[in-house]
């Protein structure tokens, strides 16, 4: 047992590193309460040794005089007050990072689980991340091409954006996420007057994938998918399974984002971070909050959940003078398909839009079942247009939205008055609605459409209407693109 230093500097605290305690006074869920501890620090890492010799890691959550509350990442079963010893390390939780982490699989705590060699760290970084000076942030620009028409044309994702997938139980969000990982690449920005090129700089593109509370089937699906399509060497996987400790879910996204920050800002890579399932993360947060007996907020979630989610989502972006970027696509499953549930509700406030996966489209065998009407990308305007995608992109997107919305209204009206009462114009909108869903929204899981193919397909659908009904597209653009033999 270590000794307490005499006359130690008060600012540093009176705790000597390595001091061990046998003062466990209680266990509540994933928390251990310690008594008679000298100088514990908030967020300090502790090593817990059980009576049988096994060790676990924990983090100080709360300090009150000589009392400390520690959350244990590997769970609290087997911890007693007789044989359990707790050692304070004086360090915050850091994770080893290296370029060698690409192509590897780790558990939720960042330990390799793919039977590969240990990682030789190039640095140890605090998992909470470094604070970024807001004035050093660069506005997200340049489109990330996903190969999915509804996202690329109507909800374009900018490099450095954070945009979630709002899904629900039983919907194919995992398949969509895997498809995005397979097909994602940058659209190179070129000088005005030239066409942009789709999906460039793939060698500089990396994916960090963090799974929280997923079942073994989902974990195997992603692992197999990455290996089969040959993209595994640019992917780092962090897997916290449903049978892993709940508390580990709180650190998994932070370890993943710390790795992403290293790859982006130190190695100059364009990193796409996919976090699934943020609903499991929110439930883990609620569990810790309940164990600490905090006053619950809406539906039992803690009042600080908004702040906590922001500490994850706001770690996306670009920094002045650094070539790399972090783009985030968190996935969350809405309980009972309820978009007003605290998790999607607060997520929508923080992130820059959302992509909505729709059950009705899924029930009609349309894949990917992305409903464009409630979907939104707030930074789309800075990622598209001449020199970045094509000059007609914005107008085509607006016209597709307008016609699809009118088509939905006509469909509802048809259910009331019958098809005979509809005008010839209404019937055009119904034809557009059907073809839009069957040809534009629907595409195969391995069907990659670059942005130019998607825009050309959109024009094919818009030609259902006479020119005078395309109110959202300027005459100049119509002259260039409306006729079938227009030069693209």
UniProtKB/Swiss-Prot annotation:
Pfam families: ATP-synt_ab, ATP-synt_ab_N, ATP-synt_VA_C
GO BP annotations listed: ATP metabolic process; vacuolar acidification
Taxonomic superkingdom: Eukaryota
Signal peptide range: none
GO cellular component, as recorded: proton-transporting V-type ATPase, V1 domain
The keyword Transport appears for this protein: yes
GO molecular function per UniProt: ATP binding; proton-transporting ATPase activity, rotational mechanism
Keywords: Hydrogen ion transport, Ion transport, Transport
The protein's assembly and partners: V-ATPase is a heteromultimeric enzyme composed of a peripheral catalytic V1 complex (main components: subunits A, B, C, D, E, and F) attached to an integral membrane V0 proton pore complex (main component: the proteolipid protein).
Function: Non-catalytic subunit of the peripheral V1 complex of vacuolar ATPase. V-ATPase is responsible for acidifying a variety of intracellular compartments in eukaryotic cells.
Family according to the record: Belongs to the ATPase alpha/beta chains family.
Protein name stated in the entry: V-type proton ATPase subunit B 1
Source species of the chain: Hordeum vulgare (Barley)
Classification of source organism: Eukaryota, Viridiplantae, Streptophyta, Embryophyta, Tracheophyta
């Amino acid at each position: 047992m270590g000794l307490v230093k005499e006359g130690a500097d008060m600012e540093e605290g009176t705790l000597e590193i390595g001091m061990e305690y046998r003062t466990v006074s209680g266990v509540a869920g994933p928390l251990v309460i310690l008594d008679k501890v000298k100088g514990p620090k908030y967020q300090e890492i502790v090593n817990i040794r059980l009576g049988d010799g096994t060790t676990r890691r924990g983090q100080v959550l709360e300090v009150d005089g000589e009392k400390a509350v520690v959350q244990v990442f590997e769970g609290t079963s087997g911890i007693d007050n007789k044989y359990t010893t707790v050692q304070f390390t004086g360090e915050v939780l850091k994770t080893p990072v290296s370029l060698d982490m690409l192509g590897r699989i780790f558990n939720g705590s960042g330990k390799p689980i793919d039977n590969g060699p240990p990682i030789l760290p190039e640095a140890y970084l605090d998992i909470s991340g470094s604070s970024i000076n807001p004035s050093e942030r660069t506005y997200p620009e340049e489109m990330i091409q996903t190969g999915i028409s509804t996202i690329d044309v109507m909800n374009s994702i900018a490099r450095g954006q954070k945009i979630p997938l709002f899904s629900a139980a039983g919907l194919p969000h995992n398949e969509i996420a895997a498809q995005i990982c397979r097909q994602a690449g940058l659209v190179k920005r070129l000088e005005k007057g030239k066409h942009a090129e789709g999906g460039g700089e793939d060698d500089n593109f990396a994916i960090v994938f963090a799974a929280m509370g997923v079942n073994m089937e989902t974990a195997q699906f992603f692992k197999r998918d990455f290996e089969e399509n040959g993209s595994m060497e640019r992917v780092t996987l962090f897997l916290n399974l449903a049978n892993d400790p709940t508390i580990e879910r709180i650190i998994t996204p932070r370890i993943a984002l710390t790795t992403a920050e290293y790859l982006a800002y130190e190695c100059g890579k364009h990193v796409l971070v996919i976090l699934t399932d943020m609903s499991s993360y929110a439930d883990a947060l609620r569990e810790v909050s309940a164990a600490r007996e905090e006053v619950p907020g809406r539906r039992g979630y803690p009042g600080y959940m908004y702040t906590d989610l922001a500490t994850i989502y706001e770690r996306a972006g670009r920094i002045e003078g650094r070539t790399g970027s972090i783009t985030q696509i968190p996935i969350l499953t809405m309980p009972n398909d309820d978009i007003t549930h605290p998790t999607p509700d607060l997520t929508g406030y923080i992130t820059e839009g959302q992509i909505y996966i729709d059950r009705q489209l899924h029930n009609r065998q349309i894949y990917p079942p992305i409903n464009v009407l409630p979907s939104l990308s707030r930074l789309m305007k800075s990622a598209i247009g001449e020199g970045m995608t094509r000059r007609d992109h914005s107008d085509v997107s607006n016209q597709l939205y307008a016609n699809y919305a009118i088509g939905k209204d006509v469909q509802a009206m048809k259910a009331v008055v019958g098809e005979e009462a509809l005008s010839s114009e209404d019937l055009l909108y119904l034809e557009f609605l059907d073809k839009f869903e069957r040809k534009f929204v629907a595409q195969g899981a391995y069907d990659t459409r670059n942005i130019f193919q998607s825009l050309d397909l959109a024009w094919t659908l818009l030609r259902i209407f006479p020119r005078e009904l395309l109110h959202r597209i300027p005459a100049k653009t119509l002259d260039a693109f409306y006729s079938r033999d227009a030069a693209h």
